[in-house]
Amino acid sequence: MLDFIKGKVITVKPDKIVIQTGGIGYSVKIPIRVSRYINRDEETQIFTSLIVKEESIEIYGFLESSERDLFEELIKIAGIGPKMAINILSTYDRETLYKIIDHEDIKSLSKIPGIGKKTAQRILLELRGILPSLQYEKDQKYDDILSALLNLGYKRLEAKEVLDKIYNNEKDEATIIRESLSILAGKDGK
Amino acid sequence: MLDFIKGKVITVKPDKIVIQTGGIGYSVKIPIRVSRYINRDEETQIFTSLIVKEESIEIYGFLESSERDLFEELIKIAGIGPKMAINILSTYDRETLYKIIDHEDIKSLSKIPGIGKKTAQRILLELRGILPSLQYEKDQKYDDILSALLNLGYKRLEAKEVLDKIYNNEKDEATIIRESLSILAGKDGK
Amino acid sequence: MLDFIKGKVITVKPDKIVIQTGGIGYSVKIPIRVSRYINRDEETQIFTSLIVKEESIEIYGFLESSERDLFEELIKIAGIGPKMAINILSTYDRETLYKIIDHEDIKSLSKIPGIGKKTAQRILLELRGILPSLQYEKDQKYDDILSALLNLGYKRLEAKEVLDKIYNNEKDEATIIRESLSILAGKDGK
Amino acid sequence: MLDFIKGKVITVKPDKIVIQTGGIGYSVKIPIRVSRYINRDEETQIFTSLIVKEESIEIYGFLESSERDLFEELIKIAGIGPKMAINILSTYDRETLYKIIDHEDIKSLSKIPGIGKKTAQRILLELRGILPSLQYEKDQKYDDILSALLNLGYKRLEAKEVLDKIYNNEKDEATIIRESLSILAGKDGK
């Protein structure tokens, strides 16, 4: 629901900022390593994730939408809540985390406060499944269409097989989507 | 609660846009077939439906309020959640869907990802009951008054019977409502 | 949380309006008898009540804050939800409802759609307890202080007894509150 | 989520104000002793706490962020909800409350409406544990870093031990955080 807040930074704490737009000051939780890049009284854009629980509504914020997207993937993993996800991103940035996953570097993962060896192994397993979708398959357009087909309920393998056959960066998005849908609809014997 | 958002489109993905008003960027899920009509950096009005769950608040958006109304009718059908409803509207627009219902075209309905033959039949049944209310009975004013009487708790048959007797497009809305209510209150032996 | 919305009326239906402020159009449910006093394209102030349920957030709106306050009292009565409360206020305005209560006019109460004789009797009983607090005891200041003392947890009888002793419209609110609290704290043997 | 509202005060009641920003009037519950410092039609900044329940969203407001922070600590104590916390802060301001805790003054605590002797003793016990964190350990920067380390999951003793070793007000926040995290990560044998 809430993609970003653009406003004036009012306060900066190691793990929280207050950013104002209109007459409202929003308090936003941030990864500790990010606070040094945010300055009081400056106009800033924070990419946000609205976390709704039965008795709380909180906003988590990031300087890049790709880091916010990674945060939203992390909290889909069973056992990783917003607090643990922000700990992970407080300790390592996105690129470092990819390397840790690629090198199966359990030791670095378990340096994150609150993460023991067993949790580190489970996170490694789950992140391996997610990270490809967070690194561009081919390019942004290909990825956007693939994720739309997955959201429609098609399996990754099925969607990629069709997309790889017809994908060509010259074609516009709408054409590629229409072609994929008609092949996929046909493939399902519908 | 949220009828529309008027703002500048920041990003357009096949199934999602980000639209900004004030300092806030709202992320809005849209039917895939609609994204080709939305352009980045353009001032746009999106008719919205706020979907509140225990652990999420999401916004679904449409270029026409009638399509948003159809979406809100679809999600009242048991077994059809927002995701399935957006799949239906990603595959077919409103007019096509009416034809499919009128011609009891199960084959086309089951082309929608995630919808098998059995679900298609059930949707057909339920949609037949809803669609009349989404196509104008006589005209907008007649429909608005009828839906207000239904919301007050009167049965469709009872309300239509009274409305058909006294309805005349020349009369203003308040008069028609007052007359219907007094007849309906009288008819209930109250 | 949401006391009022000031904005331009975009659409008026018998039981619903859309009012815009900033780039957001809010959809607000209203009593049917009120829609005739609201005109499209006019700047209007609507006094609101935000109704939060597990799977919905809705706004109910009124042209006067006293009618909104009555609505919020009605929905505190067991068995009366927002829909029934808006039916009551769609059928009768505040003054008429007071007369109905004063004259114990069950017949008029049960003319409200969805309200049978038994419910009418129960509403009558409960409304008798509430209405005094909605009609000014003495004046607005007296009522505001009385309701603040009740919110603090003091019984109506206890609070009125103290307030009646020290109340004088010439004194300012803060002084009256301080004097009442010190007497009440003393009376509790604290 | 909601740190403050800056706007024009529309109404002031003993325990509630309405403050407007943009076209929205927000109703905010305040401690009774604070209302005398708030004037109608004046531009005011209210530090807020958004209280989300299954069937309500309410805003509690304070003239100082430190009083709001104390309110948010109080409601973490089992058995103290927002209503009781606002009663406590309606009866005593922050400084007086500190003295009451320091002097273990049960009598004053139980003067708060709704608080008997037993609850007073329990509150005393719990507040003793919280108050140090609300009074500056050394200075604002030291406190912000300490609370960030606690939020990351480190124990207070462990975090304070490391922070006391390396803390020096000349160093900037980012450096102190980086140094503490590397020592803490090392200390955990990670």
From Swiss-Prot, chains A, B, C, D:
Localization annotation: Cytoplasm
Region (Domain I): 1-63
A Pfam family assignment: RuvA_N
Record keyword DNA damage present: yes
Region called Flexible linker, residue ranges: 139
Chief location bin: cytoplasm
Molecular-function annotations in GO: ATP binding; four-way junction DNA binding; four-way junction helicase activity
Superkingdom as given in the UniProt entry: Bacteria
Segments for region (Domain III): 139-190
UniProt xrefs under SUPFAM superfamilies: DNA helicase RuvA subunit, C-terminal domain, Nucleic acid-binding proteins, RuvA domain 2-like
Keywords assigned by UniProt, alphabetized: Cytoplasm, DNA damage, DNA recombination, DNA repair, DNA-binding
GO cellular component, as recorded: cytoplasm; Holliday junction helicase complex; Holliday junction resolvase complex
InterPro entries per the UniProt record, alphabetical: DNA_helicase_Holl-junc_RuvA_I, Hlx-hairpin-Hlx_DNA-bd_motif, NA-bd_OB-fold, RuvA, RuvA_2-like, RuvA_C, RuvA_C_sf
Gene Ontology BP annotations: DNA recombination; DNA repair; SOS response
Region of interest (Domain II), residue spans: 64-139
Keyword DNA damage: yes
Cited function: The RuvA-RuvB-RuvC complex processes Holliday junction (HJ) DNA during genetic recombination and DNA repair, while the RuvA-RuvB complex plays an important role in the rescue of blocked DNA replication forks via replication fork reversal (RFR). RuvA specifically binds to HJ cruciform DNA, conferring on it an open structure. The RuvB hexamer acts as an ATP-dependent pump, pulling dsDNA into and through the RuvAB complex. HJ branch migration allows RuvC to scan DNA until it finds its consensus sequence, where it cleaves and resolves the cruciform DNA.
Family: Belongs to the RuvA family.
Notes concerning its domains: Has three domains with a flexible linker between the domains II and III and assumes an 'L' shape. Domain III is highly mobile and contacts RuvB.
Subunit record text: Homotetramer. Forms an RuvA(8)-RuvB(12)-Holliday junction (HJ) complex. HJ DNA is sandwiched between 2 RuvA tetramers; dsDNA enters through RuvA and exits via RuvB. An RuvB hexamer assembles on each DNA strand where it exits the tetramer. Each RuvB hexamer is contacted by two RuvA subunits (via domain III) on 2 adjacent RuvB subunits; this complex drives branch migration. In the full resolvosome a probable DNA-RuvA(4)-RuvB(12)-RuvC(2) complex forms which resolves the HJ.
Name used for this protein in its record: Holliday junction branch migration complex subunit RuvA
Species of provenance: Thermodesulfovibrio yellowstonii (strain ATCC 51303 / DSM 11347 / YP87)
Gene name for this UniProt entry: ruvA
